[in-house]
Amino acid sequence: PRKVAELDPDRFYMHGSPYEANWGRPESWKIADSHNWGIWYGQKPFESLDTEIPRFMSEFGFQAFPEMKTIATFASPEDYALESEVMNAHQKATIGNFLIKKTMGLYYKVPEDFDQLVYMGLVLQGVGVRQGLEAHRRNRPYCMGTLYWQLNDSWPVVSWSSIDYYGNWKALHYQAKRAFAPVLVDAIKEGEDLNIYVMSDKLEADKEVTLGLRVM
C-alpha cells in the first residue's frame, strides 16, 4: 500500500479480497467485498442469504454432484453410493457429502436411491444459490453485485460449479441464468407480507409494464 501511495497517490487500492472476513462477521458486510460461506461451512439454511447482505458478494456457493452421465465416466455401477471409495475420491470437501444430505433434509425428502439423490442435490444447489443471487439483486443499490463460486471444473468431481468438467450445465447454471435475467420478478415472504420485487438492468426504462397476479 505504501508503494502504491508513493507512485500513484490518486489510485484506489484495496488490500485483498475479501476485504475483511471470509464469512460470519456482520461488520464485514458493510464495506468492500465479502465472501459468505455460511450456507456451506456454517451449515446455515438458505434463508440466511436473505438477510446477510454485503456491499458486493464476491464468493458464495453450495456443492452438488455432476449429473449421472458424468459420474459414469469415472465410476462403475457398483460404486454408485454416496460414501463409496470412488465417490469419496471425487469429493475433496472434508464433510461435503454430509452437508449436502443435511441441507437437503431441510427442504426435501432425502432419496435412498443414489441417482435420485444426485438429481435432488442438483435441484438443491440451484435453488439455494439462486436465493442468494436474487437477494443481492433485491438489495440494490446497497449491494451492487454478486459472484457465485464457481463456474466450472478442472476434472469430473463433486463441486460448487454450475458447469461440470464436460461442459454439461447443472441445474444451478439454469437458475443463475434466470436470476441474472435483464428483468427479474421476485416474490418473497417477509414477515406476514408477500412482497413483489421487479428488478431491471436495462439501460432504458420500459414505457409500459403490466404485472399480473393470480392467487391459487
Features from the language model and the residues they span:
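Repeat-solenoid scaffold signature
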Residues: 1-15, 23-29, 214-216
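Short acidic, flexible loop segments centered on an aromatic residue
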Residues: 203-216
